[in-house]
Each structure stands twice: as structure tokens, then as C-alpha cells.
Swiss-Prot record:
The chain crosses the membrane at residues 12-32, 49-69, 77-97, 102-124, 138-158, 165-185, 197-217, 225-245, 263-283, 286-306, 342-362, 396-416, 431-451. The keyword Cell membrane applies. Disulfide bonds: none annotated. Residues 1-11, 70-76, 125-137, 186-196, 246-262, 307-341, 417-430 are periplasmic. The keyword Oxidoreductase does not apply. It comes from Escherichia fergusonii (strain ATCC 35469 / DSM 13698 / CCUG 18766 / IAM 14443 / JCM 21226 / LMG 7866 / NBRC 102419 / NCTC 12128 / CDC 0568-73). It is a multi-pass membrane protein. This is Putative multidrug resistance protein MdtD.
Length: 471
């Protein structure tokens, strides 16, 4: 990339800053949840909604981000994304109640939903095709550093300042990024087809109200009748989308995608698999602090081995899949993650704290292998004319399933615990034990889906790529 113009390199730095802000925010909040609950006078059982409100908003807004960038221009949308994310961060820090915090997190989510996909689109437009991979590696590197710094930085800020600072640190970075975007980034636009507003609204309503219904009386305090009503509205909205998308060439996501068997299996497995995996980043720091009495900073440090294991495994995951095939790898890693979850619970409750970093490192390795395998399985056989749509749908499903996973984790804590779980409670560790056992079962269930993946040991990633490049 040294032969790129200085202006292009600066534009890549702007995109990289956006990736860093978004990735840091996904992990820095988790460590601060118990302190937020204490400050806002809320039960820790309700704090999962701080994560859900952000991730669910990202899932809802993702399908519109690419169209908006093409229609309005990448500079305008990227600038808007940074401004909304920064304003959301400010409002989060100023929140005095949980409801105010949830609304501010949703505003952050609108910005976060546009920041990463529009950043990728920007790189595609400003960098020559032969240098695209190198450029994407450069801009996504800060996105890998964010999850590594997030838990420890969040714990440090909470322990030695207050939870408000996990949001306030975004403000100077956001201001610099917004100014640099206006000054340095070109405003590329493209001719766009008509946006499928009807399909977008149906999907948005379906995802949002079903997640709220799942949260139920434990999180939202709704009556059983209201929960049933929300569930009915959500199901009807999704059914109406299926009817809307049938034989509709302008649908947000074409149903032709599901004619590819590996896409259907991969998407179903990704949805179910990330529900289980989505529980872990939320539950682990909460368990360490409330269940075991760790300080916020200590709990944040304990999360670093998991991120290191995930980053380290990415270097060899392709060779692993090439050697053993998708079915074996996905079934083994799904069951393995369930067993590692049980191992983490057991070692923690037995007080073997010196073993926990090794267990979390192993958890990161297994989870990373499964994530990478699920992603490539889902997309590898799609025809070129459906690849972009399939990738967008997968991105949306990833965010939706993670929000559902966090919701279910909060629901399990509510089912097994009382309204106020605290470190001093004699039943707290029992509550967490039953919750972890239930999570391990949920994590293992997608193995039944992955067992239906064709036995492709000899039709692996490298071969599949060569076939597609030859077409």
C-alpha cells in the first residue's frame, strides 16, 4: 500500500478509526454492567438490555446501510454514522435511568450499523482491486485490537473512575473522525434501485418485537397477554415478509438464496450457534464480578486470553477445515464449546482461578474456529449474483442471533434467580451454576444442524475457492 496516494492512505485511517470505535464498544460495556446496575439502582438481571438495545438496532439497520451509502454518498453516510455514534455515546454517559440508557444505546446502534459496512464500501471505491485485500487487512486490524483492549479498559475505567467514561472516551475520537471525514473523504455515489421499504419495515418489526417478547416479564415487565401479542405481531410480520419476497426481484433478501443447501444449513447453524456464543461475552464478566467477587478490572483482564485465543486461531482455521471438512469441524467445535463452557463453570466454582485464563484461551480458539467455518460454509456456494445479498443477510442474522443470545442469558438468570442477585447472596453461585448448565445445553444443540452438512472433507475451502474463481 506504500504506492497509494497520501489522500487515500488518510481515508483508510479514517475508516480504521471507525472500525476501532465500533469494535471497542462491543466489548467495553460488558465489564461495566454490574457497576451500571448499582449506579442506576437496577437489578443486574435487567442490564442485558444495555447490550440487546445496541446489537438489535445494528441488526435492524444493517440492510439499509449499503443502499443509503450508494444513494446519499459514502462520505455523507460515514459522517452521519460517526456523529450518531458519538452523540449516542454522550447521551449514554448522561443517562440517569436505565430507559434513558437504552434509548441512547439504540442511537449508538444506528451509527454502528452504518459505520462498518459503509467503511468496507468506501475501501472498495478508493483502492484499486489488486490492493483491496491489503487495504481491508489494514483497516480491520484496529477492529481486532478493540475487543482485546475493551474488557480491560472498561474494567479499568469503572474501577478507577466511573462507568460513564466508557462512553465519554468515544467523544474526542468521534469529533476528530467526523472532521477528518468531511475534509478528506470523497463522496462517492452510485445509481441505486428502489429501496424495498416494505420488506425492510416488515423485517424490522418482526425482529424487534420477537426479541422483546422473548425478554418477557423478567426484563420488560410485560403481562403474559402483552407478550403473546408481541409474539403474534412478530410472527405475522415475518410471514408477511416471506409472502412479500416470493417472486419479488426487488425484495430486500431474495428467497432464491435458500435454494443453495449450504447457505440454508450455514445460515440456520449460524443463527442457532451465535445464540449460544452470544451469551458468553455477556455472562462471563457478570459471573466473575457478581458470582465470584472479582473487581471490574480483574474481570476485564480475565477476558483477554479469550480474545488472544480467537485471534491466534484465525491463522490456521483454513488448514483445519481443509484437513477435516466442514461437517466434522463444525460438529466438533460446537460440542467442544459446550464442554469448555462446562469446564469454565466447574473450575470457577471450585476456586481454581489460576486455571481460568487457560480455559478462556481454549474457549476463544474453539469459538473462532466455529465462527470462521460457519461464515465460509454459508457463503461459499452462492452464485455471484446472490453473493452480496447473502453476505448482507448473514451479517444481519449474526447481529440478531447475538442479541437473542444475550436476551436468553438474562432470561435464564431471571428464571433461576431472585430479583436482586448480589455477591453477598448465598444462592448466587447456585443461580449461576444452573444458568451455565442451561447455556452449555443451548450451545450444543446446533450440532444437530451441522451434522446435516454434506461430508466435504475432499471438497474443502481451497478447492471451493478455485472452482469459483474459474467460473
Amino acid at each position: 500500500m506504500t504506492d497509494l496516494p497520501d489522500s487515500t492512505r488518510w481515508q483508510l485511517w479514517i475508516v480504521a478509526f471507525g472500525f476501532f470505535m465500533q469494535s471497542l464498544d462491543t466489548t467495553i460495556v460488558n465489564t461495566a454492567l454490574p457497576s451500571m446496575a448499582q449506579s442506576l439502582g437496577e437489578s443486574p438481571l435487567h442490564m442485558h438490555m444495555v447490550i440487546v438495545s445496541y446489537v438489535l438496532t445494528v441488526a435492524v439497520m444493517l440492510p439499509a446501510s449499503g443502499w443509503l451509502a450508494d444513494k446519499v454518498g459514502v462520505r455523507n453516510i460515514f459522517f452521519t454514522a460517526i456523529v450518531l455514534f458519538t452523540l449516542g455515546s454522550l447521551f449514554c454517559a448522561l443517562s440517569a435511568t436505565l430507559n434513558e440508557l437504552l434509548l441512547a444505546r439504540a442511537l449508538q446502534g444506528v451509527g454502528g450499523a452504518m459505520m462498518v459496512p459503509v467503511g468496507r464500501l468506501t475501501v472498495m471505491k478508493i483502492v484499486p482491486r489488486e490492493q483491496y485485500m491489503a487495504a481491508m487487512t489494514f483497516v480491520t486490524l484496529p477492529g481486532q485490537v478493540g475487543p482485546l483492549l475493551g474488557p480491560a479498559l472498561g474494567g479499568l475505567l469503572v474501577e478507577y473512575a466511573s462507568w460513564h467514561w466508557i462512553f465519554l472516551i468515544n467523544i474526542p475520537v468521534g469529533i476528530i473522525g467526523a472532521i477528518a471525514t468531511l475534509m478528506l473523504m470523497p463522496n462517492y455515489t452510485m445509481q441505486t434501485r428502489r429501496f424495498d421499504l416494505s420488506g425492510f419495515l416488515l423485517l424490522a418489526v418482526g425482529m424487534a418485537v420477537l426479541t422483546l417478547a422473548l425478554d418477557g416479564s423478567k426484563g420488560t415487565g410485560l403481562s403474559p397477554l402483552a407478550i403473546a401479542g408481541l409474539a403474534a405481531i412478530g410472527v405475522v410480520a415475518l410471514v408477511l415478509y416471506l409472502l412479500h419476497a416470493r417472486n419479488n426481484n426487488r425484495a430486500l433478501f431474495s428467497l432464491k438464496l435458500f435454494r443453495t443447501r449450504t447457505f440454508s444449513l450455514g445460515l440456520a447453524g449460524s443463527f442457532a450457534g451465535r445464540i449460544g456464543s452470544g451469551m458468553l461475552p455477556f455472562m462471563t464478566p457478570v459471573f466473575l464480578q457478581i458470582g465470584l467477587g472479582f473487581s471490574p478490572f480483574h474481570a476485564g483482564l480475565m477476558m483477554i486470553p479469550m480474545v488472544l485465543g480467537s485471534m491466534g486461531m484465525k491463522r490456521i482455521v483454513v488448514q483445519v477445515v481443509n484437513r477435516f471438512g466442514y461437517r466434522r469441524v463444525l460438529v466438533a467445535t460446537t460440542l467442544g464449546l459446550s464442554l469448555v463452557t462446562l469446564l469454565f463453570m466447574t473450575t470457577a466454582l471450585l476456586g481454581w482461578y489460576y486455571v481460568l485464563p487457560f480455559v478462556l484461551f481454549l474457549q476463544g480458539m474453539v469459538n473462532s474456529t466455529r465462527f470462521s467455518s460457519m461464515n465460509t460454509l454459508t457463503l461459499k456456494d452462492l452464485p455471484d449474483n446472490l453473493a452480496s445479498s447473502g453476505n448482507s443477510l448473514l451479517s444481519m442474522i449474526m447481529q440478531l442471533s447475538m442479541s437473542i443470545g444475550v436476551t436468553i442469558a438474562g432470561l435464564l438468570l431471571g428464571l433461576f434467580g431472585s430479583q436482586h442477585v448480589s455477591v453477598d447472596s448465598s444462592t448466587t453461585q447456585t443461580v449461576f451454576m444452573y444458568t451455565w448448565l442451561s447455556m452449555a445445553l443451548i450451545i450444543a444443540l446446533p450440532a444437530f444442524i451441522f451434522a446435516r452438512v454434506p461430508n466435504d472433507t475432499h471438497q474443502n475451502v481451497a478447492i471451493s475457492r478455485r472452482k469459483r474463481s474459474a467460473q
